[in-house]
């Protein structure tokens, strides 16, 4: 959290009030004709990874509940949460936090949630909040989510909304390949149905939750939630509509379009013009993978790729080795594959150290203005340029990763992105997107995981 952005109190006000769902919330809230004052408590952001330690979870819960206890007056609580956090001792971190907040505030103080649409909605989360709203699109648009959350919260305070929530779990999880709402497809249709429902009289919000598929928890699964103005029958009716649509379209949601690495590289090489995006689906850093898979790099070497290629790799050991050697040096490295378990292994290469940099990189990405790559270097292997960093940052999924080193992404033939859905930052140059069926912690073949708790 400290690496990606952890701010408390006034530091949160100064650093976190202008971005993401909190920024959208504040923009709308400032326009409300009501005297009020925000009490910033804490903002913690971290990329997807393994479970939270119990100490980390206790820190956040304690910080928030202690702030609520110290406050002279609390009229409402706004929480901007992802919704799929897991700790070693808690399979539902958000539900645990909400219950703790409710224990402090009592039942009369409204709690409103802004959630990522990849949240795992649970009984505890719904029971201990008054209203909720999820992201409206994929790629994410957290600003709009925060705006609607503010509308819900202040309508409650002004007596314009008596929130009533109906929600449904759907016995379904799918891979990530059909998660986008930007092209035509089942996810777009599902989200558009929610917007249609949301436009109806008496409906305050309608949210769809295609849960991120890499958490093995007892209440796991897709969900929907509808908030109405004191009309449970209306909420139930439309929650059922949304749930039934997802279930009826499950075969379309399960359609897998990714192809084997060898075929993907060949198809990219056969492309006549423009940039080809290779989506490394098994090593998606936004889904919790380590960002150090060597599968596609090895295949490029095997096929003797001569066209310009850009990719990223997380490997602190190689970063240190390259920095010690210095710019212009040629070094032998054992690159990548150190955190991928059995999915990927290091590759031995002779490379040139072309640049050294890193640190905080400016990029408006996934609700943030900057990201940290730690120390980073550029290694050159023939026509392939590899940005190797200590942390994954955004995994090369934003051009700023390359701009930082003076590399123009538009000149590349292929760029490997460590995501299965966040391609939008390269849209101006992209001629083709190829999803690659790579093995890894976020691979599309979710049937290959050892599920133990999922219902």
Language model segments and positions:
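Extended hydrophobic packing segments that form well-structured cores
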Residues: 247-250, 360-455
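Active-site histidine-anchored catalytic micro-motif
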Residues: 4-5, 52-61, 69-162, 280-297, ...
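Conserved anion/nucleotide-ligand pocket segment
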Residues: 150, 155-195
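Structural motif
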Residues: 36-39, 75-77, 109-113, 130-133, ...
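Short acidic, glycine/serine/threonine-rich loops at helix termini
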Residues: 50-53, 89-91, 122-127, 144-145, ...
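N-terminal glycine-rich anion-binding loop in soluble enzyme alpha/beta folds
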Residues: 1-67, 221, 225, 232, ...
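Glycine-rich phosphate/diphosphate-binding loops that line cofactor/substrate pockets in enzymes
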Residues: 31-36, 40, 66-75, 265-276
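Hard-cation-handling environments
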Residues: 178-382, 387-391
